[in-house]
Amino acid sequence: MSIKTYDKENSEIHVKTPVESTLWKQSQKKAFNKLKSKINIPGFRKNSSSPQFDKIARAKISKNDIWAKAIDETLNSTFEIARKELDKEDLERILGRANYRVSKITEDEAEIEFFWPVRPEIEDFKYKNLNVKFKEVKVTKKDIDQRIQSLMEMGAPIEESNEPAELENEMVFDFKGFIDGEEFEGGSAEEFKLKLGSKSFIPGFEDQLVGLKAGDEKEIKVTFPADYYVEEYAGKESVFKILVHKVFKPKAKEINDETIKELGFKGVSNLEQLKEYLRPSIEHKLLEDSLTEFKNEAFNKIKELNDIKIPRGLLLEEMTAINEKFNETLKAQGLKRREYLEMTKLSEEKVAEQVKKEAITKINEYLIFEQIKKAENVTISDDIIEDHYNIMAKNYNIEVDKIKEFIPVDKLKEDPNLLNEQVILKLLEVNDKSAFEKANALGKAKNPKSSKGKEKNNG
């Protein structure tokens, strides 16, 4: 008889299930026969069926080895029995695959305990009245000019320039970093090449390089993030001495009717039409940025207001995935893990702490999305899908029907990113109705068929 329990602290459903008695006996016999087939005993042919051979083989093979193989043999059938104990509500709460442990084992009986990570029970989940502001979306002349400039630079040759650097330009420079007046490990480089805006450095670093030109020297101040991977630097203010060697800019095409026509946008043949055409996609990008900013701040508040238990099984899965990705990144950079640890002066224990911290952050976000989705019954409607097709058609300059050929409706209905976007909008709605209505109106305005009249009155 199976026994089901709920581990609230680790947010897991546990089911203890005995292995069927006859199956357990047969599996041990089968396991022994497999193991004895690999043993060579002088005076006997290999895998002999004689009782004397079996007696000697049993003395050589440990019970634990037999039981381990026998458990493997019975695992699937026992799992299916355990799974029948889960009701509809249990199945809806499960967030990942089951793990197991052997809770009882002898020659006569065995019991396997399966445990599934589940969505935690959060009593009185608080996600409303967070007092988080939504940044108003407004397209400026500068936004449009920058987008046009980037279009004119697409595919253009890169050349050295004496002009001040802008975002997306490449820069070659020396830097030397100091914390508390002391130069710190890994904080210096010579003739380092960087694309400004790539976010390769800590926040604020690249922004302060904008406007510098070849030969310029500057001291910039930045603060390491509180969760920075090198604990000794986390949260500390640092000063970097910068010397710029070179700035590279794309040689942009001249903006005229001819180069605008070459972009291939339907119905666009001059500058005013191009500005009109680009405004919705720029607006959409700004809307996405504002929603992301709102989400980050709102989720931080939600974490403070609620006791969210992290499912142990999900945490282990996420930590494994992060570790594997980390190793792949090191391999792509031609580094071994040991070399990385030596360079950064980190121990495996410190890396494990950081991996766990990152995993908890990701799982917290996932659980908050799931909790709001359930509380507000958020789904992807047909209208949302149609709006999304229209946005993609506008952004990629492709007919809606062509987009639908590449991305069928069923795939969009299951798109986790699109669903999460609806969750964020719902969170905005229940916290700031006025801001939601403005954001939702902007989302609808992305439909190319209905946006033109509105765009002329903006920014």
Swiss-Prot record:
Example GO BP: protein transport
PPIase FKBP-type domain boundaries: 168-253
For whether the record's keyword set contains Cell division, the answer is yes
GO MF annotation terms? peptidyl-prolyl cis-trans isomerase activity
State where the protein is found. Cytoplasm
Its recorded reaction(s) are: [protein]-peptidylproline (omega=180) = [protein]-peptidylproline (omega=0)
PROSITE patterns recorded: FKBP_PPIASE (PS50059)
Entry-linked SUPFAM superfamilies: FKBP-like (SSF54534), Triger factor/SurA peptide-binding domain-like (SSF109998), Trigger factor ribosome-binding domain (SSF102735)
**What EC designation does it have?**
5.2.1.8
Query: Which keywords accompany this UniProt record?
Result: Cell cycle, Cell division, Chaperone, Cytoplasm, Isomerase, Rotamase
What the record says about family reads: Belongs to the FKBP-type PPIase family. Tig subfamily.
**Notes concerning its domains:** Consists of 3 domains; the N-terminus binds the ribosome, the middle domain has PPIase activity, while the C-terminus has intrinsic chaperone activity on its own.
Instruction: State the protein's purpose.
Output: Involved in protein export. Acts as a chaperone by maintaining the newly synthesized protein in an open conformation. Functions as a peptidyl-prolyl cis-trans isomerase.
Q: What name is this protein filed under?
A: Trigger factor
Phylogenetic classification of the source organism:
Bacteria, Bacillati, Mycoplasmatota, Mycoplasmoidales, Metamycoplasmataceae
